[in-house]
Amino acid sequence: MGKALMVLGTSSGAGKSLLVTALCRIFSNLGYDVVPFKSQNMSLNSAPSIEGGEISRAQYLQAIACRKKPSVRFNPILLKPEGNMRSQVIFMGKPIGSVSAKDYMLSRKEELFRKAMKVLDELKERHDLVIIEGAGSPVEINLKDYDIANTRVMLHAKAKGILVTDIDRGGSFASIVGTMELLKPEERDTIIGFVFNKFRGDKSLLEPGFEYLEKRYGKPTLGVIPYVEHRLPEEDSLAEFPKVKGELHIQIIKLPHISNFTDFEPLHWANGVDYVTRPEELKGDVIIIPGSKNTVEDLLWLRENGFEDAIIEAHREGSFVVGICGGFQMLGEKIIDTVESKRGEVKGIGLLPAKTVFEKTKRTNHLNAEVLWEPARGMAVEGYEIRFGRSVSERPFSVIKAINGAKTFEPEGAIGERAFGTYLHGIFHNFAFTERFLNFLRVEKGLEPVSIERWSIEEEIERFAKLVEENIDVERILGELGL
């Protein structure tokens, strides 16, 4: 039977996801057979698993850090918010329904928790170490009785716990004390120490706080991780991207149900992006409509709030328009939807020659494709699809050459006048394509072509893991785990 280590946080955004990612790589580098686990995640950023299911991007990244193929077992329950206090429930990678928060808490949660714990038990049997990520804070008084992602998991797994806090926000010592005081004695006993994340400054200034924590709780500070710029996606971190107007003004519309905005991280690093919330702001060189958890409702929101007219006017004035997944569907001529919104046929924005019909079966696949858009024609790209819709266009953006490694020949996406749309999430992580796309626009604007910096998720994981390893007591953690 393997061991379990759980990372809890004093709040959302404390650094749990990335600390788990780093620990996964650290223990993998030490030769341990390690896997990640999060019983329940609420996120609009998802990715395909090896089984053809859907998991959170955080556990997808952690699987890569473990050198494992991403599996639905690493994130059995995924909640995808739909608005109006409702979420789509995905269990073991497949949608099983849409419920209100109250109904979920009262009806489905316990059943799914039992099933998720069975998955966790199986992971412990098969691997040396399972590193578990908690969710939000483990001691929210109004939610504790319904919480199936934190201390109940830790106690079930007989895991050792690490409590991480974001010191960059301020109040980290108070947050740790408050969390520890609200934990039950048996929960507090599982905590082996504390980690302070995103610290800037002289670490010695924190010593009085460390001494206080050790004296009060008998538990050490295991590490202080310096604040560092990195390119690893932080879960649901849209707010982390400031408005940046580079030499090209790239605007992304912040839809009410925006999903998979990790698609645009390469654009952020290569040029800068501007997330737009008002239609009068739409005057960029590029306007992007991102993916959406509820395509038709977001299309109607664009229409009712003046964005549709602003997009058409900006396009007429020379803006290049791009749609990714749901954004592509919105830019087409029409959508027939009896699945997500059940509104039937809805007129699209009409900038792309495409028609979309929603189907009940969700496609969740890794794709290899060849681009047909003229400035990058013939270029090989890869990405993934997570969608209900099937679109038809006489001018496809690309041809899918392989689905999950199996050869195929399937047109996808659409090309319009100064516009394209694609189902390929991760298209801009193909750096050769992104460089070609940006330079096409730069030359149009009278700017010199540039070479954009290449980087890989693998390199970023290794770099961040090394930083964490240098700043936490790995030997002590190993000792506590009995490894």
UniProtKB/Swiss-Prot annotation:
This is Probable cobyric acid synthase. Catalyzes amidations at positions B, D, E, and G on adenosylcobyrinic A,C-diamide. NH(2) groups are provided by glutamine, and one molecule of ATP is hydrogenolyzed for each amidation. It comes from Thermococcus gammatolerans (strain DSM 15229 / JCM 11827 / EJ3). InterPro entries: Class_I_gatase-like, CobQ/CobB/MinD/ParA_Nub-bd_dom, CobQ_GATase1, CobQ_N, CobQ_synth, GATase_3, P-loop_NTPase. PANTHER family: COBYRIC ACID SYNTHASE (PTHR21343:SF1), DETHIOBIOTIN SYNTHETASE (PTHR21343). Belongs to the CobB/CobQ family. CobQ subfamily. Keywords: Cobalamin biosynthesis, Glutamine amidotransferase. GO terms for biological process: cobalamin biosynthetic process. It comes from the Archaea. SUPFAM superfamilies: Class I glutamine amidotransferase-like, P-loop containing nucleoside triphosphate hydrolases.
